[in-house]
Amino acid sequence: FDNTTLSVVDSLKATDKNFVILMDSLDDFQLDIESVSNSMMGLLKFVGSMNKPRDVVDIRFCLPTELYRRIIKISSNPNKDFRRSLKLQWTATELILIGAQRLKIYLELYYPDFLHGLGPLDPTGRSDALKLFGAVLPKTITNHAGFQEETISYILRHTQLLPRHFLMLLNSIFRSNGGTQSLNPFPVSEARILNGIRQVEERIVTEIFVAFKLIYPTAEEVCKRCIPELGHKFSVGELHRVYTRRGKAVF
């Protein structure tokens, strides 16, 4: 093992490259259990102490943003354990670029003639990515409130700006295609977009509640009680009144 490690490090140094190891986060952090909390404290100390700026091998432990403040409190020395921490946050543009690359592969497989007719496109560039989406989606869509909205904005609005959410929605929209290349189903109909989102949005909402369950265990029930009582727009005062009347009963 030692020889292998030295060989890898020497190779990375020779090519002036760094190797990053990402330890993915758990799905369920049971931090209210003392043994789990103590284990997490030790893990944070270990990861925080072993990485140095000049190391060619960088080990990164991924933590969900929703639990960041809770985990900071577990750390025995946050200044040391988190001195090289990075917050990863996706933007709408980045999601569009990721989605466009997937979309291009889809078109190459099932609608190559249609894709060829669009001319050369680079889905890693913002302009071409938007052009690709503009070719397969209607420019606007009528939302459930009866207002016109840009289609790509409408789809993104149903995500937490996470790639997996955006890809889940796109997969759902394009999955029920049922057509052939000769039928040319583009732009996708408004009904298919609305139906595709409807089939996935509940799973996304459930995922969000699960992510916050450790910190806000009653959030889902409070939302079920309060949201039906609120309009599309409401003041802080209205929210407070509805919460006092309906939400507090959960506790």
Report the location of each language-model feature.
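The catalytic "switch" region of P-loop NTPases
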Residues: T4-S11, T15-V20, S25-H144, E190-N195, ...
